[in-house]
Amino acid sequence: MSSSKTYCIFSANYLPNVGGVEKYTQNLAFALADGGDRAIIVTSNVFDLPAWETLRNGVEIVRLPCWKILGGRLPISRRNAEYRALYSRLAGKRIDYVVVNTRFYRHSFEGVRLAEMKGIRPIVIDHGSAHLTLGSKILDVAVAQYEHAVTRSLKRHDADYYAVSGASCRWLEHFGIVSRGVLNNSIDAEAFRRSSSGRDFRSELGLGDDRFVVSFAGRFIPEKGIVPLMDAAEQLSGESDVVFLLAGDGPLKREVEGRGLPNVVMLGRLDAPDIVALLQSSDAFCLPSRSEGFSTSLLECAACGLPPIVTHVGGVDELMLDESYGCLLSEATAEEIVKWVRVLEDDPERCRAIGEKLRGYVEEEFSWPRTASKVREACAAANSSRTSD
């Protein structure tokens, strides 16, 4: 008799939307499938893709119809005829465990509802370390109130809570939730490097080896720290040897473009293979985020042996054991960023040593098979405790 299990993973957003939760969901599902289990991803159909899709590795993707609130950042299911048909088909599947990624989306309740229908105690994995921000004090207050309201409602349901980092565990305490442990973000470092498109961004942009290249990859939104990063670039604009390469898109794109800084190159939204090539063409990676659960970008830069310049957000405690693993910003300010850029630029040997040490640590400690095993244990424990209550 087969011991394989079926894991149903709920994530409000999924690829091609770019984000850490989306990548976490994909990699977890693939790792479970590679280990002999079945995985079904249930998400929102933000991009009008096929409603039900089976990938070559057997992973199924179910895309529920949705209202695309905030440009798709906050999708809410449309419970129309298509939704009812999809959910009925999903409910008819043999499902052993339910995993819900993040607690503050209405989509999370879709997972909890299915779990209750199946008599399953779900696990909820938190990916944050601070409230969401839209860059407006008034809107941010409303978003925080919304997050608290959704979380209070979710807490009424039976579930075990986990987080992707120690910082996320501590953030759950803000909502009166005690995390049962860490199910950390991970990366297949070797496969990530192999996936590179091979583009030579230095050559394409006419940047010689004497130029110190600092890269950024992520959404152009306030919480990613794009504004202080541009302030730092402006302070360094008179120094011709430092150049910032920015990959991504978002609401603050026009503000960044409007600066017209000579040492900033906007590359637009890059495909994953080009992101790898960008990191491999860089000297350092900067992510002055306000909030991260466990930054996927930080793992990716580590996989490429690139020294990070990063704020003390989720994942930093796990990855950067001390200053020999990276450069920790005391706060997300231009002055702090400039300080660390200059430190690395002036000491190439230190720059290289940090990257090599971080890369070795990530390869040894942060693999997806290991995280998938932890998820299996968490799901089994959740349902074992339920039957013994």
Model-assigned labels for residue ranges:
Residues Y162, G208-K224, M230-E234:
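Conserved donor-binding/catalytic core segment of Leloir-type glycosyltransferases
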Residues P307-V310:
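Short hydrophobic beta-strand element within catalytic cores of glycosyltransferases
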Residues D322-E323, C327-A334, V343-P348:
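Conserved acidic donor-binding segment of nucleotide-sugar-dependent glycosyltransferases
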